[in-house]
Amino acid sequence: MTKERFKELMQPIADGLFGKQKPYHMQQGTPPVVRPVGMIVEDLCAISDDEWAKYAFSREPLNGKFTEEQRVELTRKAMACGREYAERVVKEHGVRDPEKLAEKLGMKVDYPRMPQSTDRVLFAEFREPNKIHIYMDGVDKGEVLFAEPGVRHALTAQLDIKKLLLGHELFHWVEEKYRKEIWTRTYRLRLWEVGPVHNDSTVMVLGEIAAMAFTQALNNLHYSPYVMDAYLVYGYSPEAASALYEEMMTFAGRTPRLPEEPEPAE
């Protein structure tokens, strides 16, 4: 595969991932080694919460303002925030299932095939005040991959892609409702200060990290939903998914595996 063809494949995926990431290989224009999807999810499901911090912050506009220790600390706090609010809404409404919870919260959820604008891949989105779209093209492609070797074992039968996406988007509604008190909105980073004058900013990625923890708690998953960044993209481009896999593993301080060499012919 040429660099030009790889860039062409990657372009519509760049801004449409679950975590809205752009893989390093896209920036470099170098095609990755394509891995089996079962290998990808097996390795990514083993990454710990702290190890996801560097990947999560990698596209945060203010990323350079933080040390590695601060990224880990903020990731822990954002995840704790997401889990706290998951348990809060479950206790308040008496249901954990994301579809039933969405109904209790008065959300209008629909399941169109694809977004109206088809220039990029998009899996789900929240639109104020109370609309959530789950795009079934990506969901269906992900469900087809369940049949691939190792996928169901890694992701477990507990995974329902629609509910995972829905839970993630529900957090954005929760975050908006509690915007005056929720930690992901009240945390501020001081950008500069001159005497009594200063400029503070929210940190966008904290809401995404919390949303991942929120839907993880609702769906009772043992692995981070960030795994879906690579998994759902695989249905569109194994090359793009493999690029994300390499980047995720590297950011986590782990060595990306290569596909096994084929057995010699008899």
Each language-model region and where it sits:
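A metal-dependent hydrolase signature that marks the N-terminal structural subdomain at the beginning
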Residues: M1-V144, P149-V151
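Active-site recognition of the HExxH zinc-binding catalytic motif
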Residues: K163-E181
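A structural signal for well-ordered alpha-helical scaffolds and beta->alpha junctions
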Residues: G94-V95, G167, E208
